[in-house]
């Protein structure tokens, strides 16, 4: 491995033993350098890294190598390569703590700030993924932003964009905003965004780009042309597309930006930031393939679903005469995409809830240049009005529970509070099991604790799994819970209320400051604690008012949020002139 001459004398016997193990495991003498490297890598993956003692020796050898590093450019570059390679290998093989040690040792050895930051980005991202907030996170974020500013000042928008995106990756990491802690953006946008706003590169991408948009062509005598575009996620669009395709006088096309040919127009996050910086420096415009350009030229209205990649991408397109309407749900508000969108290229933005709108308005300066609307998602709520099954009044329901944001542990707290008074109550968790893949350390720890609690409740907690027939499943549920830490609208809550289940809604803590569920639903539905949730249920059941309260909630939600009520408002935005 080229490290033996850097190993301290006290460790050399063990290092030689490890070297012999490598040679024995490698077998035949390699016939080429490439074959030799491949053989050594197999031994590392199969014999060295999985073994605790050998892995510890490997780490100590690298740390010794890093401590004895010289300041020569060649030696510094070697340290960087070795740290990146070894750190990624350890991460891939399931040893993130060891990878953090490697990156930390490499950072201490490197003299050149930009080279050291290559390891810093890997180390801090890995710590965040493990569910830990690095003690030096904000200092390193400032380093990345300062480097982005220097490259931008030198006219290197590509490198500036790379460094700026790395800063966004850290500042908006899911551990900070979507896992087991309050999002610092939602808690205090000004304080959270202050380091970004101090950066010239970030201020550049937030600045609206002056432009003259061409006059829209007349649609007289032909159908209104609606182009619907997104990046991969069509979850909330299926019914809407069907409805508009069936509407006389409307012609619909769709465009998934993930499916367009690869090229300089890619909608990858780092490319979007680079393109945005080039745009602010009067660089060449973002020009898509001819067939994509034709679709935008064809359209009278472009409906961009999700305020994420597609939003930033479409906002930079030149010469768009169509009306550009974007819809923002909840997730996107906690990403950097709305911040580096060129809002000069957008006409209208639709928010699915007032509290998400309030948060984005506080965080994103450019949004104030755009007409803003609040229109909830499509829901055919009349289909949920079905008779309840016997015993449903003692069944609590939670629709969708397989992530930390839904916080199903809070539902267990409610059940526990109810059982202190009446052990007939059960909790039914509808939907897929708690996710095991692509989770952070915090999410994995949450799941482990949750599953232990569920097992302890025995038959009082039911997990029937995913169902395609939610209206039928709701017949057996008499109380619909919303236990989330953050929501946009919570479709399952609206559907449950429409079915005649009593709605009991936690005051979603991550967005409570911005209005929370009370910005969408009656205040009487909202509670602060599990004990208050249990008290609402027991009080209405004990007084004989459970049935009437549930009926009133069903009537209210259907008259407010059924698609028959909501669609005319969306029609006005999508089908009107620019």
Predicted regions and their residues:
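Aromatic "clamp/platform" in nucleotide-sugar-dependent glycosyltransferases that forms part
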Residues: 485
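A short, active-site helix/loop in glycosyltransferases that binds the activated sugar's phosphate group
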Residues: 336, 345-371, 379-381
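Conserved donor-binding/catalytic core segment of Leloir-type glycosyltransferases
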Residues: 389-406, 412-419, 428
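Nucleotide-activated donor-binding/catalytic signature segment of Leloir-type glycosyltransferases, i.e.
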Residues: 441-466
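Acidic anion/phosphate-binding donor-loop and adjacent secondary structure
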Residues: 214-215, 334-338, 361, 376-394, ...
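A charged, aromatic-enriched C-terminal amphipathic alpha-helix characteristic of glycosyltransferases
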Residues: 78, 382-385, 405, 541-575
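Short hydrophobic beta-strand element within catalytic cores of glycosyltransferases
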Residues: 502-506, 512
